[in-house]
């Protein structure tokens, strides 16, 4: 029986590996979950369509989830621009208990200023980054490591050290992306289900 609901944007390059990703999440978390995805083009995950996508999540996707899993914690996550979108989503709505922002594109112009004024509403915040991602001379990508470090310090101040995590992985932005996503989602599953099990009647109802 699932103990948690995962929500993520699904870009075309992720589709063929989705089942593998889910298997890795199950292996890493050791707990049941259900995943809801919505298909997007990666370029839609910042600026122009994000408001429309958020409206779809809040008005349509969440309603479908609550019809079956209203008592389960909700986690939103993504990779690259999807990771940035997931983190941004939690600054606009409090519906998600946790966020897994894996190798998020925090180098986007204006992000730090935006987040300073609009902190995340999630209870648990996970970020990850490849150790080589900042080892480049290309702007703005070379800034991503320091931006992630500053972002993590904000998370510590907002939710506390036990409620946030910054994981450094081997490799660059394209190394083991499915495993990185799995570890992020698994951390969120573990945190949001730490005091619940499938027979616990005290879990929240939205």
Question: What is the predicted role of each segment?
Answer:
Residues 191-206:
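Intrinsic disorder/low-complexity segments
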Residues 1-192:
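Non-catalytic cap/lid and distal C-terminal segments of serine-dependent acyl enzymes
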């Amino acid at each position: 029986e699932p103990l948690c609901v995962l929500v993520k944007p699904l870009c075309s390059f992720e589709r063929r590996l989705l089942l593998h990703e889910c298997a890795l999440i199950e292996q890493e978390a050791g707990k049941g979950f259900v995943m809801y995805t919505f298909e997007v083009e990666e370029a839609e995950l910042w600026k122009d369509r994000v408001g429309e996508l958020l409206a779809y999540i809040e008005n349509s996707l969440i309603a479908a989830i609550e019809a079956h899993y209203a008592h389960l914690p909700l986690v939103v996550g993504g990779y690259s621009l999807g990771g940035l979108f997931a983190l941004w989503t939690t600054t606009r709505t409090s519906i998600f208990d946790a966020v897994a922002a894996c190798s998020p594109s925090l180098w986007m112009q204006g992000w730090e200023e935006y987040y300073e004024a609009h902190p995340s509403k999630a209870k648990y915040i996970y970020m990850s980054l490849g150790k080589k991602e900042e080892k480049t001379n290309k702007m703005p990508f070379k800034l991503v490591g320091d931006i992630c470090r500053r972002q993590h310090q904000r998370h510590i101040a907002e939710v506390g050290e036990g409620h946030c995590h910054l994981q450094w992985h081997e490799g660059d932005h394209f190394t083991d992306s499915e495993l990185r996503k799995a570890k992020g989602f698994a951390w969120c599953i573990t945190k949001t289900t730490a005091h619940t099990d499938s027979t616990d009647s005290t879990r929240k109802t939205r």
